Amino acid sequence: MLRIPVKRALIGLSKSPKGYVRSTGTAASNLIEVFVDGQSVMVEPGTTVLQACEKVGMQIPRFCYHERLSVAGNCRMCLVEIEKAPKVVAACAMPVMKGWNILTNSEKSKKAREGVMEFLLANHPLDCPICDQGGECDLQDQSMMFGSDRSRFLEGKRAVEDKNIGPLVKTIMTRCIQCTRCIRFASEIAGVDDLGTTGRGNDMQVGTYIEKMFMSELSGNIIDICPVGALTSKPYAFTARPWETRKTESIDVMDAVGSNIVVSTRTGEVMRILPRMHEDINEEWISDKTRFAYDGLKRQRLTEPMVRNEKGLLTYTSWEDALSRVAGMLQSFEGKAVAAIAGGLVDAEALVALKDLLNKVDSDTLCTEEIFPNEGAGTDLRSNYLLNTTIAGVEEADVVLLVGTNPRFEAPLFNARIRKSWLHNDLKVALIGSPVDLTYRYDHLGDSPKILQDIASGNHEFSKVLNAAKKPMVVLGSSALQRDDGAAILAAVSSIAQKIRVASGAAAEWKVMNILHRIASQVAALDLGYKPGVEAIRKNPPKLLFLLGADGGCITRQDLPKDCFIVYQGHHGDVGAPIADVILPGAAYTEKSATYVNTEGRAQQTKVAVTPPGLAREDWKIIRALSEIAGITLPYDTLDQVRNRLGEVSPNLVRYDDVEEANYFQQASELAKLVDQEFLADPLVPPQLTIKDFYMTDSISRASQTMAKCVKAVTEGAQAVEEPSIC
């Protein structure tokens, strides 16, 4: 197992050997034979004893070892005997040698593990009944399996003061066994050197040295990798036991990455959200917003239909009354008098149902909140608005040019991939835009969009770096396209991507042009033919406007005529609901089986974990019921039929967990030459500059008290939200 050089891992200066991230297969002639309890196994040179054992299905106990972290070798729980060797060895750190016979269950191995476990438990408080890790604790499981049935420790146990590292992670450091997983995660994966050890021997402690908030958008992952109960979730504390909850596999919609998650529920309530393994998207990590914003699902919810009365106040009503009012308006208008805006958390089923509904009244004014330039290729070519290299593809790149984006807070798991490749490979990163605090070193080329013109013409110094690259990537943030010169920026990036693709001589399957989206619904909406941006609605104000989860504030009441009838359909009383004449309560992503498409064009499904609150219903069902009352019944009654319709409109939307290869980059580049737009003098400034801007970006996270505490802790310090411990 390759160790990351200490200097590089801790302060990010040196480079570790190539090939750590994605290794190629080894020729059979180079394999060596070893034996695990007498069973032969062929492994690559450099394979550790632990990896060789796992290859034959033999699980070796461990605390400090983690597959995605560097090897520490400090817990000693993985000690095994090597036949004819004088001493037991640490399986996680010892490379195998040809002909070794590894004895995993010999008396010597058992005695060594028992001794290690005895030392680990010597200072452990043994407070399992009040520990949130109970039931899913490695220390519990391994002490039961490999430990002794009695203790010889009679002395007093040490006690360690708990650290306040913010409103998300609860620390009970007396339980800590100094495995250093959290420290290695912080420095290697998160790229934040906030955690470390102080003292030595019995006085060693893990903490931040100077008490401060753990400033990372990935901080919650240290809860998952902690093998004991030293680091647990503050919002989840004392709420449920793991065996009491029902687990539902789903996906996250807090950003456009589409991280795979597990939703744990009990009695119809979301108790917590955990990561689910997906090697091509989020590996086994999730962002803090994904993990902790679930309390926003319980607050500010729309649970019953509402209508605005004669006094201008919103009052509760029945579904029949609300739908009848909207149906009456729908029957009164047609064509451009009817329009719709889709928000950032809307699923593909609702998008296609709304599209079909408006098409029934001869309207095609269907817009998204996010802008995407229509000039040039616009959204006609799918490759023009996708992360074509894919998220995992970053690990193969040797140069990445970031334009107008801060991936650390717009797409934390994509940023973690960039850091992973930068740390283990010779990845060079450059940024055009406002300087931001990324978790890797980068060359800041400036913040003017005119730099793109210089690079495209070959007059910029960085042009040489791009042309010399073997697998270059250009990543354009969708936030840069919200500007008035968005078309010029997109055209310049398209031109750069095409030129360096030719210069690099990369294989045809390597894609250079990439768009990094910020919201979960955008790609599906563009696939279904929605118009990006609301300019069409501003120019031709409708008489009837549907806001489908539109809470981005892209349009206000002042932008519309006084007689415009607004229908809001969504799950939170956020920005869109207060301006509506009728409110139709919808279901959140944990309450429906729905399709979302991430920034790389991968379709995935959420699953029903809990039922919608009150009288709320799934969005496509509401639209289907409305169509029937309006006398323009949509031709589907079940979810499967809606998905069949999805497949008719855009087949890639029902090819789940598959990234359809996008092409026509040369055509897009040629069309980009037709764009006649000047660059603005304004600098490229991403909307999420600091971690404070990361926590509250949509209707769910804005309703979350936990996310509000995070913002307060960042601005005022962790002590501002300190809560008294109850254990």
UniProtKB/Swiss-Prot annotation:
Residues 245-301 form the 4Fe-4S Mo/W bis-MGD-type domain. The gene is Ndufs1. [4Fe-4S] cluster 1 binds at residues 124, 128, 131, 137. Keywords: 2Fe-2S, 4Fe-4S, Acetylation, Electron transport, Iron, Iron-sulfur, Membrane, Metal-binding, Mitochondrion, Mitochondrion inner membrane, NAD, Oxidoreductase, Respiratory chain, Transit peptide, Translocase, Transport, Ubiquinone. Core subunit of respiratory chain NADH dehydrogenase (Complex I) which is composed of 45 different subunits. This is the largest subunit of complex I and it is a component of the iron-sulfur (IP) fragment of the enzyme. Complex I associates with ubiquinol-cytochrome reductase complex (Complex III) to form supercomplexes. Interacts with MDM2 and AKAP1. This is NADH-ubiquinone oxidoreductase 75 kDa subunit, mitochondrial. Its main location: mitochondrion. One of its GO terms (biological process) is mitochondrial electron transport, NADH to ubiquinone.
